[in-house]
UniProtKB/Swiss-Prot annotation:
Belongs to the universal ribosomal protein uS9 family. It comes from Rhizobium johnstonii (strain DSM 114642 / LMG 32736 / 3841) (Rhizobium leguminosarum bv. viciae). PROSITE patterns: RIBOSOMAL_S9. PANTHER family: RIBOSOMAL PROTEIN S9, SMALL RIBOSOMAL SUBUNIT PROTEIN US9M. GO terms for cellular component: cytosolic small ribosomal subunit. GO terms for molecular function: RNA binding; structural constituent of ribosome. InterPro entries: Ribosomal_Su5_D2-typ_SF (IPR020568), Ribosomal_uS9 (IPR000754), Ribosomal_uS9_bac/plastid (IPR023035), Ribosomal_uS9_CS (IPR020574), Ribsml_uS5_D2-typ_fold_subgr (IPR014721). This is Small ribosomal subunit protein uS9. One of its GO terms (biological process) is translation.
């Protein structure tokens, strides 16, 4: 451990210990990240471009027909003020459409921070980098559902 003779020394030690977020880009200039939500897992690649978003080989508006799901997917891009600056390619599997949209959103957020580490603070504040850990509660025996009991008859 470093020798701490004053509070000023403490600041230099803590700065050195904090991990610096480094730009992670492959040989093709893309950043890769995985996003998860419920049972859906998305693999996302982000690269500079015109703003085209492709999900499982289809245009994102075609894959996610509901406007709410399209809005969920675009949230991190709009929050980072990078609308129309990145091409996004995602493959997503598992779960339903809502979980898949959340998984792609999580993956896009992580990939944006890998590509441009300066966006991390904005996306973290918006809650886009946090994995939403809520999943369906399992059904218990002796119950109709996870918590709902069978109908009770007094007589």
């Amino acid at each position: 451990m470093a020798d701490l003779s004053s509070l000023k020394d403490l600041g230099t030690v803590s700065e050195a210990a904090a991990p610096a977020h480094v730009r992670k880009v492959d040989s093709l200039g893309r950043s890769y990240a995985t996003g998860k939500r419920k049972n859906a897992v998305a693999r996302v690649w982000v690269k500079p471009g015109s703003g085209k978003i492709t999900v499982n080989g289809k245009e994102f508006a075609e894959y996610f027909a509901r406007p709410v799901l399209q809005m969920i997917l675009r949230q991190p891009i709009v929050a980072a003020a990078r609308d129309g600056q990145f091409d996004i390619v995602a493959t997503v599997a598992g779960g339903g459409l809502s979980g898949q949209a959340g998984a792609v959103r999580h993956g896009v957020s992580k990939a944006l921070t890998y590509f441009e580490p300066g966006l991390r603070a904005v996306l973290k504040k918006g809650g886009f980098l946090t994995r939403d850990s809520r999943v369906v509660e399992r059904k218990k025996y002796g119950k109709a559902k996870a918590r709902r009991s069978f109908q009770f008859s007094k007589r």
